[in-house]
């Protein structure tokens, strides 16, 4: 499993928990994030299967010949918007260090022929990523649109799954809250096994 932009390692830890025989590699360009990730990895029961590297996706794809069966990412997603005065915050939230096209190119190079790529993005950015993957014949096979509440008109995030082989697309709407301060049954179900 490859976690692109691992941050503090939360997705990597979740993957190690859900896939007990998998090795997980987290990559990030921020040294403090990688150090925090490694600390979190050392404190977990899966530490022998977790690695973190300070390297960009652009560099990693050039040096690693492995194909991954699963790639996950919660990538930077703000495009052409006001950046922060903090370069760390800007890199974590904006596509200045990893564009949608670079993400698509890297995933195409590193994903095995039967592998899956999962990511979490705002709705508009997810549309742009789907378009970027067209060049590589990578298709969105599942999309879950996440809303804060059932009566909301706009999704706050899309959880997308991509595959190199064309298959049918599954589309769902899901909600985080049933009402203010009360998580939905779906949200409780998907987070029930996470040990964080």
Where are these predicted regions, by residue range?
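SAM/dcSAM-binding transferase cores
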Residues: 151-196
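Conserved SAM/SAH cofactor-binding pocket of Class I
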Residues: 1-64, 70-73, 79-84
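Short, catalytically relevant binding-site loops at active-site mouths
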Residues: 59-60, 77-79, 124-127, 149
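Conserved Class I SAM-dependent methyltransferase catalytic core
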Residues: 99-148
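Mobile active-site "lid"/loop adjacent to the S-adenosyl-L-methionine
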Residues: 75-102
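Hydrophobic alpha-helix-in-membranes signature
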Residues: 74-75, 121
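S-adenosyl-L-methionine-dependent methyltransferase catalytic core, i.e., the SAM/SAH-binding region
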Residues: 70, 138, 144-145, 157-161
């Amino acid at each position: 499993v490859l976690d692109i932009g691992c941050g503090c390692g939360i997705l990597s830890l979740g993957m190690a928990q859900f896939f007990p025989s998998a090795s997980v590699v987290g990559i990030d360009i921020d040294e403090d994030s990688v150090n925090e990730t490694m600390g979190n990895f050392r404190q977990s029961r899966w530490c022998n299967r977790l690695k973190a590297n300070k390297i960009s996706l652009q560099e990693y794809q050039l040096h690693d010949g492995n194909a991954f069966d699963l790639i996950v990412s919660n990538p930077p997603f703000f495009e052409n918007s006001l950046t922060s005065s903090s370069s760390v915050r800007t890199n974590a939230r904006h596509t200045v260090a990893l564009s949608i096209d670079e993400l698509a190119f890297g995933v195409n190079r590193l994903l095995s022929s039967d592998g899956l790529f999962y990511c979490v993005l705002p709705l508009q950015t997810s549309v742009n990523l789907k378009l970027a993957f067209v060049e590589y014949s990578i298709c969105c096979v599942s999309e879950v649109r996440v809303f804060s509440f059932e009566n909301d008109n706009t999704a706050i995030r899309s959880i997308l799954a991509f595959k190199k082989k064309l298959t049918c697309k599954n589309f769902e709407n899901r909600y985080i809250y049933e009402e203010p301060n009360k998580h939905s049954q779906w949200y409780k179900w998907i987070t029930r096994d996470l040990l964080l």
